[in-house]
Amino acid sequence: MKIYFASDAHLGARFHKDPLAIEKKLVRWLDSIKEDASAIWFLGDLFDYWYEYKYVVPKGHVRFLGKLAELADRGIEIHIFIGNHDIWMFDYLPKEIGAIIHRDTLTVDLLGKRFFLGHGDEVDFRSKAFRLIRAIFRNKFCQWLYAGIHPRWTFGFALGWSLNSRKSGLEKQEAKKYQGEDAK
């Protein structure tokens, strides 16, 4: 049996030209590994935005979620690390399919090898702004306040923020490239 890893699918992201095609590609990959997989570890940002309200989960991702359920029903362990885009994943996936949610980095022995696992934002804390936002997002009171806002508003806001953040990051990368800062 094998253990598989995947990260940063950003399902539902507005920067994907065809979000459904990305989801279908991920489902095809899961289909291709289901015969020999004993566990699948998703290392964060499965979704571009995920917030679980008490009785509401995000629209979409049906093929992917159905495939996860199928794999879990086959006895394949599903591990999901929280990323900075799906930080508000709570108990829906553990209750529905038995997924194991990891909120922090983890050192684990798998098949006789030691791994340090987590999402990248859990490893690199250089940005003070990111640390502040992360603390706000993880604060129970702030989560409670946010949950009081209708999903119609929060989802549009979050997906727009994500898209703008990505564009800003790409612009900074291009500026560094232009200035030669990425030269080896």
Residue ranges and their predicted role:
Residues 5, 114-118, 125:
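Short hydrophobic-aromatic micro-motifs
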Residues 50, 183-184:
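Generic hydrophobic, helix-prone segments enriched in Leu/Val/Ile
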Residues 2, 6, 11-110:
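Core catalytic region of metal-dependent phosphoesterases/phosphodiesterases
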Residues 18-20, 93, 114-116, 129-133, ...:
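Surface-exposed beta-strand edges and their flanking turn/coil or helix-capping segments
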Residues 120-183:
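Active-site-proximal loop/helix segment associated with metal-binding centers of metalloenzymes
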Residues 31, 67-68, 113, 133-135, ...:
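Short, charged/polar low-complexity linear motifs in solvent-exposed/disordered segments
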